[in-house]
Structure formats: structure tokens, C-alpha cells
């Protein structure tokens, strides 16, 4: 295993690599994990941007930028006022404030440590990355640097390079649609998983991903809090099984994003463990 510095798409980057995995981190762009290559199959796991990266402007709209790879969402996702325990109301930015600011980075033997300080609220956010064989370990530490409690939510925002053979496996038989949908109906509709009924009472597979020609996107959450912190899906035409494991006591919610060309004309999906249900801290 080796860790080295270099350039990725014209940005200073840190690489961690062994016989199974090569990962690329761009500290300057919100600590983004830009690439994960599974070397035995020469397969890029993460959805890649179609245009060069641009340096984000703090407080700007998330969708104006690359929407690729893995970004950290904290302390919010939806734009929202923060009224809790502070004298002056502050507005939390779109998709949080971490993705649009440069992070610091250091190498500690076999680990990459990236960290950043909050802007609107007084906290520090640290992520520790380590690769062992064919596994990636992500550890997080959020430190409150103020004298008052800080409330917020964290979500893992990792866009994956899916295809029409991708299959999703979740530890549940019930999910909740969180977007109004021409297929799944109004937001907050309860559905069976993996097979439900669409608005025409036809069988609809929630565990599969359709063609990018469908020009639609769906998002749903596992119903209620997780009993088991795990989820997985197949990639690279069913040749690769990608598993996620996390502590369901600390991260009790799980969202699924399926983009079949409906958002920014892109084709990707995401498994999104989070500390709060959906995107609001209110």
C-alpha cells in the first residue's frame, strides 16, 4: 500500500493505492473523494463529471457544480435557517457548507486525514480514510468548538457508476418515496421493497435501475430507523458487489437516489446513509 501526492484533473490531490483499490481525494474541492478504481476489473466505481472540475463558491447552489464522486453533507442538506441556541439566526447553505470550501489534508502512516472548520457554526469536521485489501474505511469526528450544543445532520453523498444490470439490496421490505413521482406517486407514499406497484398498478422494481432514456429520477428512504447498518448493490454489469457497512445506532437512516437521466441529464445512483431522515434539520 502506498500514499502519494499528485494532480487529478488539474487539482492537487492525494492518492491511496494497494493491489485492489486506487482512491483519489481532492482536498481543495471540499475534500471530495473523486475516484475509486477497483483495480482487478479496471473499473471506476464513482460517477465521473462530464466537464472539468471548477472551484466552488461558498454558499452557491450545489447543482451548479460537478455533482460527482463522494461529498460530505453537513450540517444540513436543504437550505434552512438555523434557530437553535444562538443569538442571531444564520442560514445554512445548499447541501451544507463542507463541499464548497477547501479542506486541510495530512498523511499519517497508512491513513489520509482531511479536516475543515465550520463557517456558520463553530465546529471542526474530520474524516480519516484507510484502505485495507479490498475494503475502504471511513471514520468521522465532529467536534463542537462552541459553548452551546450544535444540531445538524450528516449524509454520505456518493454517486456511483451504475448500469441497467445494477441491483440494490437493502435490509428492509418497506421504503418511503420522498419526491413526488410520476411512477411512485406523492411524496411520503409507502412502498413494498424490492417490488411495488406503480400508479398504473403494474409491478415496479425499486431494486433495479432503468435506462437513462427514461429521463426521470427517484428517491426513497428505508421506512423508519434501520435495524441493520448495511446496504449493497452490484456494479460493472453484475461483476462487482459493492457493500456498505455502518453503525446503525449512530447512522439510523438510509436513502436511495436513482437518476435515470432526469437530473442534469446524468446517469448514476447513490446509497446515502444519514444521521437524519431526508434533508431538513427543522
Where would I find each of the regions flagged by the language model?
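Surface-exposed acidic/polar loop and edge beta-strand patches at domain peripheries
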Residues: 1-137, 145-282
Amino acid at each position: 500500500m502506498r500514499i502519494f501526492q499528485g494532480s487529478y484533473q488539474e487539482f492537487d490531490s492525494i492518492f491511496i493505492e494497494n493491489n485492489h483499490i486506487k482512491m483519489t481525494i481532492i482536498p481543495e474541492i471540499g475534500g471530495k473523494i473523486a475516484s475509486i478504481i477497483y483495480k482487478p476489473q479496471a473499473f471506476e466505481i464513482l460517477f465521473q463529471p462530464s466537464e472539468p472540475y471548477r472551484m466552488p463558491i461558498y454558499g452557491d447552489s450545489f447543482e451548479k457544480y460537478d455533482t460527482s464522486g463522494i461529498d460530505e453533507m453537513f450540517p444540513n442538506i436543504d437550505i434552512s435557517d438555523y434557530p437553535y441556541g444562538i443569538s442571531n439566526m444564520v442560514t445554512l447553505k445548499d447541501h451544507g457548507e463542507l463541499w464548497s470550501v477547501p479542506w486541510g489534508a495530512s498523511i499519517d502512516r497508512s491513513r489520509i486525514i482531511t479536516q475543515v472548520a465550520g463557517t456558520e457554526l463553530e465546529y471542526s469536521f474530520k474524516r480519516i480514510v484507510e484502505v485495507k485489501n479490498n475494503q475502504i474505511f471511513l471514520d468521522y469526528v465532529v467536534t463542537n468548538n462552541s459553548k452551546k450544543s450544535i444540531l445538524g445532520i450528516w449524509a454520505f453523498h456518493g454517486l456511483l457508476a451504475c448500469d441497467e444490470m445494477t441491483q440494490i439490496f437493502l435490509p428492509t421490505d418497506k421504503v418511503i418515496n420522498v419526491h413526488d413521482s410520476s411512477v411512485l406517486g406523492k411524496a411520503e407514499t409507502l412502498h413494498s421493497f424490492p417490488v411495488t406497484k406503480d400508479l398504473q398498478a403494474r409491478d415496479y422494481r425499486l431494486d433495479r435501475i432503468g435506462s437513462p432514456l427514461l429521463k426521470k429520477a427517484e428517491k426513497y428512504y428505508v421506512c423508519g430507523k434501520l435495524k441493520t447498518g448495511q446496504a449493497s448493490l452490484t456494479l460493472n454489469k453484475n461483476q462487482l458487489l459493492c457493500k456498505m457497512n455502518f453503525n446503525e445506532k449512530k447512522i439510523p437512516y438510509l436513502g436511495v437516489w436513482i437518476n435515470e437521466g432526469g437530473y442534469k441529464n446524468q446517469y448514476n445512483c447513490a446509497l446515502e446513509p444519514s444521521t437524519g431522515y431526508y434533508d431538513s434539520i427543522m
